[in-house]
């Protein structure tokens, strides 16, 4: 049975919610799924003053954990059109795995959030995907089999490069049913691909 890691960073809980949806989809496909998060870099007093969501259930991942999975699905919020420093710091430590080719052939995917529709969703997805390709991974996005990608009836995240959500400038908007559906769909497709490749 394929093993899937949903690895994320979430300051305010939006990506945590998306990560849970991605994991639901992967489990639906029959994979064994773990959800883990990367370490926080912001000092606790500043994170608390900034109203970060610090009570997240997922355990903290280590870089060595990456070797134990057939698929790794990475989610993080957007900072100025790119991945957060927390996720970048974590992935930058995977040089040893990269040098040994440990991640070659594993399946990967990306998901993100932005404050607005035009806040850098696709550039952030590409910054995750670039890491996955350097690791030698097989990248799977959110294909148009998910009909919610083409909706014009609502403000909605989502891209063929990965599931996304829009949070609003103050973070008040939570992932919509359509966005969560996209996350579940992507998780399922990635897990199905991992099962085909790795059993």
From Swiss-Prot:
Q: Which reaction does it catalyse?
A: a quinone + NADH + H(+) = a quinol + NAD(+); a quinone + NADPH + H(+) = a quinol + NADP(+)
Residues bound to substrate are: 98
Identify one Gene Ontology CC term for this UniProt entry.
membrane
- Which EC number(s) does the record attach to this protein? 1.6.5.2
Q: Which cysteines are joined by disulfide bonds?
A: none
Give all residue intervals belonging to the Flavodoxin-like domain. 4-190
Instruction: Name the keywords, alphabetized.
Output: Flavoprotein, FMN, NAD, NADP, Nucleotide-binding, Oxidoreductase
State the superkingdom: Bacteria
Q: How is the cofactor bound?
A: Binds 1 FMN per monomer.
**Cofactor(s) for this protein?**
FMN
Q: Which GO terms describe its molecular function?
A: flavin adenine dinucleotide binding; FMN binding; NAD binding; NADH:ubiquinone reductase (non-electrogenic) activity; NADP binding; NADPH dehydrogenase (quinone) activity
Q: Detail which positions bind NAD(+).
A: 12
Where, by residue number, does FMN bind? 10-15, 78-80, 113-119, 134
Signal peptide limits = none
Q: Which PANTHER family match?
A: FLAVODOXIN-RELATED PROTEIN WRBA-RELATED (PTHR30546), FLAVOPROTEIN-LIKE PROTEIN YCP4-RELATED (PTHR30546:SF23)
User: What protein is this chain from?
Assistant: NAD(P)H dehydrogenase (quinone)
- Species of origin reads Rhodopseudomonas palustris (strain BisB18)
Q: What is the lineage of its organism?
A: Bacteria, Pseudomonadati, Pseudomonadota, Alphaproteobacteria, Hyphomicrobiales
């Amino acid at each position: 049975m394929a093993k899937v890691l949903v690895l994320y960073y979430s300051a305010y809980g939006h990506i945590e919610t998306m990560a849970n949806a991605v994991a639901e989809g992967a489990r639906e496909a029959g994979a064994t799924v773990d959800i883990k998060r990367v370490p926080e870099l912001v000092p606790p007093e500043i994170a608390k003053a900034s109203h970060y969501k610090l009570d997240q259930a997922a355990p903290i991942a280590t870089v060595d954990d990456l070797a134990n999975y057939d698929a790794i699905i990475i989610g993080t919020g957007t900072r100025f059109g790119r991945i957060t420093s927390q996720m970048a710091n974590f992935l930058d430590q995977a040089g040893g795995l990269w040098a040994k080719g440990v991640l070659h052939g594993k399946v990967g995917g990306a998901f993100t959030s932005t404050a607005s529709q035009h806040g850098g969703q696709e550039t952030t997805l590409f910054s995750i995907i670039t890491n996955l390709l350097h690791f030698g991974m097989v990248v799977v996005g959110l294909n148009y089999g998910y009909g919610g990608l083409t909706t014009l009836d609502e403000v909605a995240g989502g891209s063929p490069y990965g599931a996304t959500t829009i949070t609003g400038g103050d973070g008040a908007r939570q992932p919509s049913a359509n966005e969560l559906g996209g996350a579940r769909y992507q998780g399922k497709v990635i897990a199905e691909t991992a099962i085909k490749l790795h059993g």
